[in-house]
């Protein structure tokens, strides 16, 4: 990878351009007037969207796809034997990680960066929705498609650039951040950082480098520790806290989750209330973080909260895909025990008298090994039935003994869980145990969403 980002990038070629993050960045370059080409192993809606904007996208990887590109952009999931990557090295082309390419764009604007182990995509979507509702025209890049906008990124005319900042490999430290939002510092990505202390250190550095304002959770223990360290290291830094804690600058209370989420916020002795369009107690907290950031930027509080409340969700975040014979099928990106608990808690608020059936795809061998017990305890506590698929390894090589069975075998009540590696068999099993009124939800940030059509087909075959 190129260590120094060039001043000019010229024509860009994106390897693995079909993913949500890469396609969003490619779109920004296209809308900023750059020539973009790319490749991916499979055709997708993201590929079609980029082609519609003028990008030449090839399906499959081949050295010829690089063409006359001046810069190669790659993702962390790239294998080093990729022919396009090898050709770029032979030609001496700059090879940028996607975070470096994004930094080249965003460091030219006033940057709002959203970081944290969970809640980044939703919080970013709320901030963008709020800014648009307040009349601003920000540029943005999000980890998921904002449903009301039909895109995960856009080049706007305003001074602000809102970005979901990736902490997984430390790349969020590349950005010249003006305003930072830290949703939480729950332990994750320890395969990269090596220890919880190093993970926390990265967030402290991220906060210290934020020039204007840091907005941080008052409820999360890791975030509290970052706040304490930040105030000691940079006593003049402007910090706003949000959450349910009594000492939070923006305090959330009176949360009602029976139906649409309603809650109240206290801010500078004033009280504001809102009702969201997305379910789940955690989204009241996410909205409070977005509110703290917008009011910290100087926007009027009541108007800010009203604009945030118009947020209608993002793809792959508690997304309904269909209902068959009274059985609803949802998909969610949750891939950490805390996220799984939040998604299933939200499901409980809408399922009524029905049961929750979780179809869980563990993500990464390292995460599965580290958190198998926590995944099992969370799934068993919040779901009535669970189907565990095999591990989606992404960038990692398989580890001996680390499969989905590692999670399933830790259930205290084995009759409530089934480890099924074959997707069709898993879909059929789910359809057979489901009954009218049940809530089926797929969980994971790999490719588990691809099982949803099989689930719906199996339900039609078994239930109708």
Curated annotation (Swiss-Prot):
Name of encoding gene: murC
Pfam families: Mur_ligase, Mur_ligase_C, Mur_ligase_M
A single Gene Ontology CC term: cytoplasm
SUPFAM superfamilies assigned: MurCD N-terminal domain, MurD-like peptide ligases, catalytic domain, MurD-like peptide ligases, peptide-binding domain
UniProt main location, coarse: cytoplasm
Coiled-coil parts of chain: none
InterPro entries registered for this protein in UniProt: Mur-like_cat_sf (IPR036565), Mur_ligase_C (IPR004101), Mur_ligase_C_dom_sf (IPR036615), Mur_ligase_cen (IPR013221), Mur_ligase_N (IPR000713), MurCDEF_pg_biosynth (IPR050061), UDP-N-AcMur_Ala_ligase_MurC (IPR005758)
Keyword Ribosomal protein (UniProt): no
NCBIfam families on file: murC
Family: Belongs to the MurCDEF family.
GO annotation, biological process: cell division; cell wall organization; peptidoglycan biosynthetic process; regulation of cell shape
Pathway: Cell wall biogenesis; peptidoglycan biosynthesis
Enzyme class: ligase
Compartments where found: Cytoplasm
Catalytic activity: UDP-N-acetyl-alpha-D-muramate + L-alanine + ATP = UDP-N-acetyl-alpha-D-muramoyl-L-alanine + ADP + phosphate + H(+)
A GO MF label: UDP-N-acetylmuramate-L-alanine ligase activity
Keyword Transmembrane attributed: no
Protein name as annotated: UDP-N-acetylmuramate--L-alanine ligase
Functional description taken from the UniProt entry: Cell wall formation.
């Amino acid at each position: 990878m190129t260590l120094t980002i060039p001043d000019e990038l010229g024509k860009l070629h994106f390897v693995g351009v079909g993913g949500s993050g890469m396609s969003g960045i490619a779109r920004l370059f296209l809308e900023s007037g750059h020539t973009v080409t790319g490749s991916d192993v499979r055709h997708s809606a993201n590929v079609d969207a980029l082609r519609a904007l003028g990008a030449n996208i090839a399906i499959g990887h081949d050295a010829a796809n690089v063409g006359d590109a001046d810069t190669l952009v790659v993702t962390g999931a790239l294998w080093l034997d990729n022919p396009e990557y090898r050709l770029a090295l032979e030609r001496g082309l700059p090879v940028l990680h996607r975070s470096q390419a994004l930094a080249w764009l965003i460091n030219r604007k006033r940057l709002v960066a959203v970081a944290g182990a969970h809640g980044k995509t939703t919080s970013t979507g709320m901030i963008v929705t709020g800014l648009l509702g307040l009349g601003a025209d920000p540029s943005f890049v999000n980890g998921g498609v904002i449903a009301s906008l039909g895109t995960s990124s856009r080049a706007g005319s305003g001074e602000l650039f809102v970005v979901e900042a990736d902490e997984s490999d430390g790349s969020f430290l590349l950005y010249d951040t003006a305003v930072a939002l830290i949703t939480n510092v729950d332990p994750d990505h320890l395969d990269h950082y090596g220890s919880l202390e190093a993970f926390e250190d990265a967030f402290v550095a991220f906060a210290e480098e934020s020039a204007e304002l840091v907005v941080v959770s008052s409820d999360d223990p890791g975030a509290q520790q970052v706040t304490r360290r930040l105030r000691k290291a940079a006593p003049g830094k402007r910090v706003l806290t949000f959450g349910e804690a009594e000492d939070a600058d923006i305090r959330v209370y009176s949360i009602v989750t029976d139906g649409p989420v309603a809650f109240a916020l206290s801010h500078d002795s004033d009280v504001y209330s809102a009702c969201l369009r997305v379910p789940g107690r955690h989204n009241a907290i996410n909205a409070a973080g977005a509110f703290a950031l917008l009011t910290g930027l100087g926007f009027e509080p009541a108007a800010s909260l009203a604009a945030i409340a118009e947020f209608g969700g993002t793809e792959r975040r508690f997304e309904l895909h269909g209902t068959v014979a009274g059985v609803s099928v949802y998909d969610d990106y949750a891939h950490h025990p805390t996220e799984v608990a939040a998604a299933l808690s939200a499901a409980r608020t809408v399922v009524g008298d029905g049961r929750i059936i979780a179809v869980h795809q563990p993500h990464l061998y390292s995460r599965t090994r580290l958190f198998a017990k926590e995944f099992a305890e969370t799934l068993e506590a919040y779901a009535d039935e669970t189907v565990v698929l095999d591990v989606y390894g992404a960038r990692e090589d398989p580890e001996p003994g680390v499969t989905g069975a590692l999670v399933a075998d830790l259930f205290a009540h084995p009759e409530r869980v089934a480890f099924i590696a074959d997707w069709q068999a898993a879909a059929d099993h789910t359809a057979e145990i489901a009954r009218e009124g049940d809530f089926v939800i797929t969980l994971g940030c790999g490719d588990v969403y691809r099982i949803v059509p099989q689930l719906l087909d199996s339900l039609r075959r078994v239930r109708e």
